[in-house]
UniProtKB/Swiss-Prot annotation:
Regions that span the bilayer: 85-105, 125-142
Name of this protein: MIOREX complex component 11
Lineage of origin: Eukaryota, Fungi, Dikarya, Ascomycota, Taphrinomycotina
GO biological process, any: mitochondrial gene expression
Coiled-coil stretches noted in the UniProt entry, renumbered to this chain: none
Major localization class: mitochondrion
Keyword Ion transport: no
Alphabetical UniProt keywords: Membrane, Mitochondrion, Mitochondrion inner membrane, Transit peptide, Transmembrane, Transmembrane helix
Gene name as annotated: mrx11
Length: 162
């Protein structure tokens, strides 16, 4: 049997590992070499980076392309990908979705209506919304439907613009 090889950045180096039992070779284990972890298999050692929830192989084409584009930030993402994704989702909820009902409540309670809107579009939208509410079983007056629709649209516009 040939000794296992190790690949780092496309270079192949030979590494002699003491003999192991077949059970250990099948399970696979990690060895420490120059402060890096390598996954042992009988034929090839591949460098892997482990986080608490996920393992990303560092020899994939996508990973190499990402390293060229982002550099230092990609290494930080590589160590803890799920924490970065969770932080993005949390900040998105905090900055985009949470202000929507707050602005809607402010516009609805202050009875504010934006000026300069074409009346024919508001009337057409109010009739469509009133027919949808009627199909759902809500019999609301047309004026209340148009006010609610206008407050929702204004809140959405403020959140998206700001």
């Amino acid at each position: 049997m040939l000794p296992p090889t190790i690949r780092i950045s496309g270079l192949a180096k030979t590494l002699h590992i003491p003999s192991r039992s077949p059970l250990q070779a099948l399970k696979g284990s990690f060895i420490l070499l120059n402060k890096r972890k390598f996954h042992y298999s009988p034929f090839i050692l591949q460098e892997k980076v482990q986080s608490s929830n996920h393992t990303i192989r560092s020899d994939t084409k996508l990973w190499k392309r990402l390293l060229k584009i982002t550099g230092k930030q990609a290494h930080q993402f590589k160590d803890k990908p799920f924490s970065h994704i969770f932080a993005f989702l949390f900040l998105h909820e905090l900055s985009a979705i949470l202000p929507l009902p707050i602005f809607f409540f402010i516009f609805h309670s202050l009875d504010w209506t934006p000026t300069g809107l074409p009346g024919e579009y508001l009337q057409k939208g109010s009739h469509v919304a009133a027919s949808i509410f009627a199909k759902l079983g809500y019999n609301l007056p047309l004026e209340k439907v148009s006010k609610t629709l206008l407050d929702g649209a204004a809140a959405y516009a403020v959140v998206k613009v700001c």
